[in-house]
């Protein structure tokens, strides 16, 4: 299976430019920031897509801000551990969170951290991660209705678990779920035809040693990133559309001037060719935003996920 990484990047040039124009106006920048090492907390283990994107960001942040930027992986409880750590950090811009939407819009609805987003100040997005419906034995989305295969996911309370529930709702039928301890064992079993289908990040497929053994059936990206592959909407499963987002946040009381400076810096980084190339190689689509746009995005996704999690009774295992 071939991922057209040039198309992933090229189709977002215009949207990047438009979002950049919206981010130019800002308050006076903090003149004495940063004045020490910045810690970029990643609430997931080292080695994954989010960690790789964080390190690409950290390298450029250090160069542009003139201070060291250290990536600190604090995994646990679907991203809650690292996220909570940042909410308790000094609000001076030197402790930042780099995360996807899981600990911001999904996990809080299954833990006691239901208001975690109110304890954070969104700074801006780096990219979004389209999701892909894949299978090793189905040939089209219509086969889901006729064959009723099992749906794999990466563990109870995971993003792929929520997406499996969304897919069942979109199809109007209940499919059996098969839980795994992460995406790697799920995809290994799929290559052995031990599980029928799953919704996974495009980046998870990019990294496979034998990607041709898994067939893409549909993608959530709003524009076709792979020639001939339908979007979820085109395939009749639009309700399951979910694009994950990666972005930077700070403790809630961080001064607006520091948030503005960080937003402008992150937006500059997103527009660097070398960063865009790195992100697309990870199956991500570069996308910048204002702090307000990122905050609105998180709340929209959080409200949507809250409904699904409540109605489906999804819990963290």
Question: Where do the language-model regions lie?
Answer:
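N-terminal (or domain-start) structured segment
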Residues: 30-119, 156, 172-196, 288, ...
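An extracytoplasmic/periplasmic, membrane-proximal ligand-sensing/linker region
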Residues: 35-37, 234, 259-317
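Extracytoplasmic/secreted proteins, especially bacterial periplasmic and envelope-associated proteins
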Residues: 52, 56, 81, 85, ...
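Hinge/capping helix and adjacent helix->loop/strand transition within the periplasmic-binding protein
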Residues: 88-93, 108-185, 232, 245-278
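Ligand-binding pocket segment of bilobal, Venus flytrap-like solute-binding proteins
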Residues: 152-230
